Amino acid sequence: LAEKMGTSVTPVRDAVLRLVQDGALIMPSPRDIRVRSLTLTEYLEIRSIRMELEGMVAAKAALMATPEDVEKLALMLEHNETALEDADAQKGLELNQSFHFELCRIAQMPILTSILHQLWIKIGPLIAQSYTKGGRHMIDYHYLVVRSIREKDPQAAKIAIQTDLLSGGNVMLQLKINETNTDWL
């Protein structure tokens, strides 16, 4: 891995160990490193936590956002539309995550941002796995978030981001249910 990245072993090893510590990777042995798969229960717990925390962030962002912030969010959505049209899942994933963390920046909640980063590290692989299957559902409610923030409506922004997490999360939920149903095979 270090060779592929054109760097020395130490920073790669440190990064891998950090991801193991954060629960994103598992390392049964020094030569066996894998992406950790969340259980259905873990996914549902993370989704519930995100709904509360990101709801709080969206509500505060609605109160704090400048017109420039709103335009930046709208531009991110335009770029995400282009990524969807181009079937560029990687770019879409990056823009989706950037959108959610831009809300944190607007809300000026750095401690909460750090907590959400930890949750995203754990759920990121599942989001990546389901993003292409989710298609439009992965960003549809972002438009309502932006409109609510533009209108300075914290309650609507909170509901919009929570609905986004539920709607986009349906694909993830189905993946986890399917895994659970085939575990006995």
Predicted features along the sequence, with ranges:
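Short helix-capping/hinge motifs at transmembrane helix termini and TM-loop junctions
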Residues: A62-L63, Q108, Y131-T132
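Short linear motifs at protein or domain termini
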Residues: L1-L63, N170-L185
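Conserved amphipathic alpha-helical segments that form helical-bundle/coiled-coil interaction surfaces
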Residues: I46, P67-A128, D140-S148, A156-L166
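C-terminal regulatory/effector modules of DNA-binding transcriptional regulators
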Residues: K4, G134-L185
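Alpha-helix N-cap/N′ positions at the starts of helices
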Residues: P30, L53, L75, H137-D140
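Mobile beta-alpha loop/short-helix "lid" or hinge segments that flank ligand
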Residues: Q21-I26, Q118-I121, G135-R136
